[in-house]
């Protein structure tokens, strides 16, 4: 199918409107050892002085190569406080180090600092932080969003202060900042990279990922050093070794010639709110892949329209449980109230320690889990999440290695529907779509937006998060704009290596 046909069917006339919204994560750290880089118009907080090789007691692997690493401030490090950009964890020292940080130290990482973010990862613009908003370095004379919640990590990479940066992606918190800052953002398959030592926002969605200026450093770090093979017994969501072997056996590790690949163009991602320049970049990228031999196939992912709504029920529900521990007794900076009255102590501590967006999501999540709302909201959102997973499984050529093909649920389709329509043609190897519907907004514009408007930034990133799929955002040049467009490659579960390899080819084609 030619690019012209795909353009006519999928891109030219937007037929879909957004019925859902969402947000992300980003955080910094502070203390007397840190300094804000105001000269560069951002608030990523970095270590003042030499890079920290410590954890220097950690033995290096034989294949270790030195590189500079920035770490998002919700990932525990032994040498820096872990504050999640929150007053309630101000100057909190971590008693241990995250598994992924240790793994990267073994591979030669020197930590240059912790990066600013949205408080506890709740936000899409890295503005909900006790350290101030992160600013986009692509707009030197303007205050523009760097995306969230891993905005500080993206900026550290963009400015060259770090070769690789760690972030977390719950609903797009790595990919959105990558799109806004012109960097590469990779969200691995859920369960591939250890979450031990990551301050949780939503356990079933949180995924540790990577940002860099190019795809290759990420690919080499994850696959050439065998990071993707390492199970962590300390993390109950880390995929077991037996499951990793099964996934590896069913998933190719090399990318064939593009003439043998089918690239899916999802119709539902062509929404009315999509900026025309980003739509043009999407079309140009699809055409570039077709010119190299790939076949473009329009596909339908009908549950996309409900994905954002489901995310903003499920993620806050999990957050309300995860953040209950911050009460001034077990964790968190204690409020000023009397210790004798428990209710006052808790309310004073949480009222003063949490920011407005965190409070909003705690309240939303608590309500979703209440007896009056559980069936109508939380359970329904779980059903939508399963439908999103089924949509992806139906269009990918590879079967999901976590499920037996016979387990595919067709009960929600009409009896008269033919089997070929139920399963779909299974003809797509990868999906190509925008990362964000718009270019980064100014910070003063964000202040005037409603929470729902802010959540809408994640409409293209949330579906892959709900399904636990690998996704990579790469920048595409846009004529007449100082900002690139973020384009996203999504693959079947555990097809991460080929997703990265295709993303590398895509980045070269649209540079």
UniProtKB/Swiss-Prot annotation:
Record-listed E.C. numbers: 6.3.5.7
GO molecular function annotation: ATP binding; glutaminyl-tRNA synthase (glutamine-hydrolyzing) activity
Keywords: ATP-binding, Ligase, Mitochondrion, Nucleotide-binding, Protein biosynthesis
Coiled-coil segments: none
Catalytic activity line of the entry: L-glutamyl-tRNA(Gln) + L-glutamine + ATP + H2O = L-glutaminyl-tRNA(Gln) + L-glutamate + ADP + phosphate + H(+)
GO cellular component terms, semicolon-separated: glutamyl-tRNA(Gln) amidotransferase complex; mitochondrion
Gene3D superfamilies in alphabetical order: Amidase signature (AS) domain
Compartment annotation: Mitochondrion
SUPFAM superfamilies: Amidase signature (AS) enzymes
GO annotation, biological process: glutaminyl-tRNAGln biosynthesis via transamidation; mitochondrial translation
Catalytic residue list: 72 (charge relay system), 149 (charge relay system), 173 (acyl-ester intermediate)
Primary localization class, coarse: mitochondrion
Homology family: Belongs to the amidase family. GatA subfamily.
Free-text function comment from the UniProt entry: Allows the formation of correctly charged Gln-tRNA(Gln) through the transamidation of misacylated Glu-tRNA(Gln) in the mitochondria. The reaction takes place in the presence of glutamine and ATP through an activated gamma-phospho-Glu-tRNA(Gln).
Record HAMAP family: GatA
Record protein name field: Glutamyl-tRNA(Gln) amidotransferase subunit A, mitochondrial
């Amino acid at each position: 199918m030619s690019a012209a046909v795909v353009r006519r069917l999928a891109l030219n006339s937007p037929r879909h409107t957004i019925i859902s919204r969402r947000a992300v994560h980003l955080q910094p750290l502070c203390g007397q050892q840190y300094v804000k880089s105001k000269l560069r118009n951002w608030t990523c907080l970095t270590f003042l002085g030499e890079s920290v090789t410590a954890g220097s007691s950690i033995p290096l692997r034989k294949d270790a190569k030195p590189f500079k690493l920035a770490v998002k401030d919700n990932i525990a490090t032994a040498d820096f406080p872990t504050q999640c950009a929150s007053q309630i964890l101000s100057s909190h020292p971590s008693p241990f180090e995250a598994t992924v940080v240790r793994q990267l130290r073994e591979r030669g990482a020197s930590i240059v600092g912790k990066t600013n973010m949205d408080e506890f990862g709740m936000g899409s613009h890295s503005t909900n932080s006790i350290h101030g908003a992160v600013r986009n370095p692509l707009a030197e004379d303007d205050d523009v969003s760097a995306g969230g919640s891993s905005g500080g990590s993206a900026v550290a990479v963009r400015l060259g202060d770090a070769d690789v940066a760690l972030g977390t992606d719950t609903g797009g918190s790595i990919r959105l900042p990558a799109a806004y800052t012109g960097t590469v953002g990779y969200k691995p398959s859920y369960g591939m990279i250890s979450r031990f030592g990551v301050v949780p926002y939503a356990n079933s969605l949180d995924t540790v990922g990577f940002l860099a200026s190019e795809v290759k450093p990420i690919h080499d770090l994850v696959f050439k050093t065998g990071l993707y093979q390492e199970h962590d017994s300390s993390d109950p969501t880390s995929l077991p070794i037996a499951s990793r072997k099964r996934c590896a056996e069913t998933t190719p590790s090399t990318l064939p010639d593009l003439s043998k690949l089918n690239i899916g163009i999802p119709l539902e991602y062509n929404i009315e709110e999509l900026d025309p320049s980003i739509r043009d970049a999407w079309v140009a990228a699809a055409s570039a892949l077709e010119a190299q031999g790939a076949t473009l196939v329009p596909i339908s992912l009908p549950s996309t329209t409900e994905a954002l709504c489901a995310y903003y029920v499920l993620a806050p529900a999990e957050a309300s449980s995860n953040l209950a521990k911050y009460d001034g007794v077990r964790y968190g900076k204690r409020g000023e109230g009397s210790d004798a009255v428990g209710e006052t102590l808790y309310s004073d501590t949480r009222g003063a320690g949490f920011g407005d967006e965190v409070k909003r999501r705690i309240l939303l999540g608590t309500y979703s889990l209440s007896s009056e709302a559980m069936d109508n909201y939380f359970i329904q959102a779980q059903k939508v999440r399963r439908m999103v997973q089924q949509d992806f499984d139906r269009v990918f050529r590879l079967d999901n290695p976590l499920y037996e093909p016979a387990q595919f649920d067709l009960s929600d389709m009409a009896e008269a529907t033919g089997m070929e329509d139920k399963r779909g043609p299974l003809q797509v190897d990868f999906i190509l779509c925008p990362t964000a519907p718009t270019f980064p907004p100014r910070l003063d514009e964000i202040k005037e937006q409603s929470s729902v408007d802010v959540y809408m930034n994640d409409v293209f990133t949330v579906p892959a998060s709900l399904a636990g799929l690998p996704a990579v955002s790469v920048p595409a040049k846009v004529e007449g704009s100082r900002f690139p467009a973020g384009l996203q490659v999504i693959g079947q579960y555990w097809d991460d290596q080929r997703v990265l390899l295709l993303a590398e080819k895509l980045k070269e084609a649209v540079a």
